Amino acid sequence: MEKKRNISMAVIRRLPKYYRYLAELMDNDVDRISSKELSEKIGFTASQIRQDLNNFGDFGQQGYGYNVKDLYNEIRSILGLDENYNIAIIGAGNIGQAIANYTNFDKMGFNLKGIFDVNPKLLGLKIRDVEIRDIDQLESFLQEEKIHIGVICVTKSNAQDVCNTLIKNGVKGIWNFAPIDLNGADNVVIENVHLSESLLTLTYLLNGFN
């Protein structure tokens, strides 16, 4: 399926939730589901779900709903998960180690190829058989390995330099957990993840119930 280029970011950010929920339905041997049933489970309106999916094709049938497996596979393809992606993690602190240890990424086709840090106490240790290397080796590693996604888990002051090194050596996707929005080239996709934003959303909602 050819992806459309004018899809709003709001729609794109809803797709992983559809994908995750459809996977749960498949695990529970559910064969089909209506947009109304999806709405009740996911929290989006049925109309919103239909509009989102119609951006990519006509997947549902009147009176039948959606075939769960077919829709799951379509969204998997839309999300680019028919491909495998090599990733490198820069920063082996708590966040970096948590990401490295998350085995579900393997199941989705994300292959951990390298982990880098500056802390001499961490160098040489292994996380799931991947050795933590000195960050001074990052550039030569990137020149030898085809890395699709760099995961940045370093300090705010070092994040942009790491990002620049990744981009200079051909990495096209940056998943950034440093508390700063990074700048990149036009042909590079950067996803800045600020963990505090989710927490502050929670405190806002909690405050509304007090």
Swiss-Prot record:
It holds the Pfam family Put_DNA-bind_N. One of its GO terms (biological process) is response to redox state. One of its GO terms (cellular component) is cytoplasm. Its main location: cytoplasm. Residues 17-56 bind DNA. It comes from the Bacteria. NAD(+) binds at residues 91-96. GO terms for molecular function: DNA binding; DNA-binding transcription factor activity. It is found in: Cytoplasm. Keywords: Cytoplasm, DNA-binding, NAD, Repressor, Transcription, Transcription regulation. InterPro entries: CoA-bd, NAD(P)-bd_dom_sf, Rex_DNA-bd_C_dom, Tscrpt_rep_Rex, WH-like_DNA-bd_sf, WH_DNA-bd_sf. Modulates transcription in response to changes in cellular NADH/NAD(+) redox state. NCBIfam families: PRK05472.1-3, PRK05472.1-4, PRK05472.2-2, PRK05472.2-3, PRK05472.2-4, PRK05472.2-5. Belongs to the transcriptional regulatory Rex family. Homodimer. This is Redox-sensing transcriptional repressor Rex. It comes from Clostridium novyi (strain NT).
